[in-house]
């Protein structure tokens, strides 16, 4: 069996172009979308990712402010910066980039991001709104998965989808987005037992556990579609996902690569969310856009 490569790059280009076009429309109204990214780490891969966001924002005409507080930033300093950015009218979107210093509680900080500027769905209010079907920005990585499935015309309505991982960033919000599309969702985690019990009956498997080589070909039935959300840095600096690509290739009907799959779509969605946030804030101050399909 030939396994289709579900590259995210063409979809990311479409989303980035849409962000650019909508930014131009806002520019005609005298509004320039601005994204603020708060960083508190010396992790080089994180800084590389943040720089990639900055470059992509520049191409779309979106302002991008990188607030680098250093790896020893305190929770109090981070809280003050987030509160100031939430109150700053010229900033439309805010990202609190992880990882954070060991002594810092991210769960206490994300609640300080104004929901209308929470373009990566980090505030618990955003996740709560998502759960009950109210307008809110979905976490960009979770939304990137469903956008990628839509782009390749892979249906989920009435089908079994196994989500491996239950984080508040991907697993939980993704399950909500899939339920909105009438999928039958199973969430797998470290206490679920043998993985194949849940992944073999699945039509679609999404892996977001942060464990290199977790999903193998033996865990799948033929024709399963696999979306790899994992981002694991190997000792040589290369990036791999959670899927054992060698054993899955030839079994799965489709597989998203790492890098070049979900990640590129995630970055593009962060930009589009920023533009949507700027539009709503400039016109009404109310958040009305979030999980609309591309």
Swiss-Prot record:
Lineage summary: Bacteria, Bacillati, Actinomycetota, Actinomycetes, Micrococcales
Catalytic activity entry: (6R)-5,10-methylene-5,6,7,8-tetrahydrofolate + NADP(+) = (6R)-5,10-methenyltetrahydrofolate + NADPH; (6R)-5,10-methenyltetrahydrofolate + H2O = (6R)-10-formyltetrahydrofolate + H(+)
Pfam family, one: THF_DHG_CYH_C
Assembly, per entry: Homodimer.
Protein known as: Bifunctional protein FolD 1
PANTHER family for the chain: C-1-TETRAHYDROFOLATE SYNTHASE, CYTOPLASMIC, C-1-TETRAHYDROFOLATE SYNTHASE, CYTOPLASMIC-RELATED
Top-level taxon of the source organism: Bacteria
Binding site for NADP(+): 165-167, 190, 231
Originating species: Paenarthrobacter aurescens (strain TC1)
GO molecular function: methenyltetrahydrofolate cyclohydrolase activity; methylenetetrahydrofolate dehydrogenase (NADP+) activity
Family note: Belongs to the tetrahydrofolate dehydrogenase/cyclohydrolase family.
Entry keyword annotation includes Glycosyltransferase: no
Known pathway: One-carbon metabolism; tetrahydrofolate interconversion
């Amino acid at each position: 069996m030939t396994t289709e490569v579900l590259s995210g790059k063409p979809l990311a280009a479409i989303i980035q172009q849409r962000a650019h076009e909508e930014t131009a429309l806002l520019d005609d109204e005298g509004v320039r979308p601005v994204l603020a990214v708060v960083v508190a780490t010396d992790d080089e891969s994180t800084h590389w990712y943040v720089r990639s966001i900055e470059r992509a924002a520049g191409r779309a005409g979106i302002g991008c402010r990188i607030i680098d507080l250093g790896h020893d930033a305190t929770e109090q300093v981070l809280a003050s910066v987030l509160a100031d950015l939430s109150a700053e009218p010229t900033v439309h979107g805010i990202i609190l980039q992880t990882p954070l210093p060991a002594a810092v509680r991210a769960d206490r900080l994300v609640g300080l991001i104004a929901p209308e500027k929470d373009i990566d769905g980090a505030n618990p209010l955003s996740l709560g709104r998502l759960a009950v079907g109210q307008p809110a920005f979905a976490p960009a990585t979770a939304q990137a998965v469903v956008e990628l499935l839509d782009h390749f015309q892979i249906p989920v309505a009435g089908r079994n989808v196994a989500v491996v991982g239950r984080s508040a960033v991907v697993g939980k919000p993704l399950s909500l987005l899939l339920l909105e599309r009438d999928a039958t969702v199973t969430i797998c985690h470290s206490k679920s037992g043998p993985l194949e019990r849940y992944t073999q009956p699945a039509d679609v498997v999404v892996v977001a556990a942060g464990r290199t080589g977790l999903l193998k070909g033996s865990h799948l039935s033929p024709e399963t579609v696999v979306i790899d959300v994992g981002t694991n840095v190997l000792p040589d600096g290369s990036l791999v996902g959670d899927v054992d690509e060698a054993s899955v290739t030839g079994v799965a009907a489709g597989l998203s690569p790492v890098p070049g799959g979900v990640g590129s779509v995630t970055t593009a969605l962060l930009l589009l969310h920023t533009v949507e946030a700027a539009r709503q804030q400039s016109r009404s101050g109310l958040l009305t856009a979030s999980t609309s399909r591309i």
